[in-house]
Structure formats: structure tokens, C-alpha cells
Amino acid sequence: MKLKANKKAPNFKLPSTRISIFELNKIKKNIILYFYPKDDTPGCTIEAKDFSKLNNLISKNKASVYGISKDSIKSHLKFKKKYKIKFDLLSDEKLSVIKKYGVWGKKSFLGKKFMGIIRTTFLINSKGKIHKIWSNVRVKDHAKEVLSELKKI
């Protein structure tokens, strides 16, 4: 399914590192929902650390960050602790939300083709509508770009 800006973000429930079950529709503020391939890999670590560094500014702009990957809660907790990540990580081991949000697709690395998570960020407003989507994200300065867009809401 191809999601678009100005459309309602699909609701979902997933296990989280902070509360037992996270439900999107229960959050009544702006949300930065970013999908990343794997805990403790170079690009994913940089992205998590960058969002973490900006977490206070994001909070001041009435928003919260949530990262989603197919890693387990156990893996997420280890990743959070190792890098002092200041926001919640959600586990989608069954790929249900990853597929619902259209971020599962063909990728290639070192000439090898495979299926995986396409690094994507959704900025969702407090009414649950998608404000902006970043696909095939380049990690460098991405968190700053998202914060800049958040300030426009």
C-alpha cells in the first residue's frame, strides 16, 4: 500500500521498549515514525543517535519519536542501552506494520539483491494525518531535516 501525505496514518499496535503495547491512535501529539533496517548497524545507529540528540527539541515541539524495525524487543533494549537512545523502539517481527506502511521492498547491497526495510520516515500530525514522508532516507542530517519540517506544523 502506498501511503500519501494528507491521508490518515494507518493505526497499529506493536510491542514497545517503554510500554507493553504501543497503539498509534492513542498518541495525541505529533509523531516522528521512522522505519530502519536493523539495530546496531552503522547507518541505523547514526540515525538513532541523531534523533536522540534532538529528542529534547522534538519534545519542545510537541512531538515524540518512535523507531520501528523487525528486531525483537530484547534486541531493541540492548540497542537502546548501548547507545543511550532516548525514545521508544517498536518491534514488528511479523512485518505487519512494515508492510502496511509500504516500507518492505527490494534492496541491493554489494551487488546482492534481497528484501528488506526501506529506510523511511513519516511525520504524522496530532490529528493522525501524515504531514510528510521521506523515502530511501540518507542518514546524514536527516533528523535535523525532520525537526525543521516538524516546526512547520
Regions found by a protein language model. Name each.
Residues M1-I153:
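Chalcogenol-based redox active-site neighborhoods
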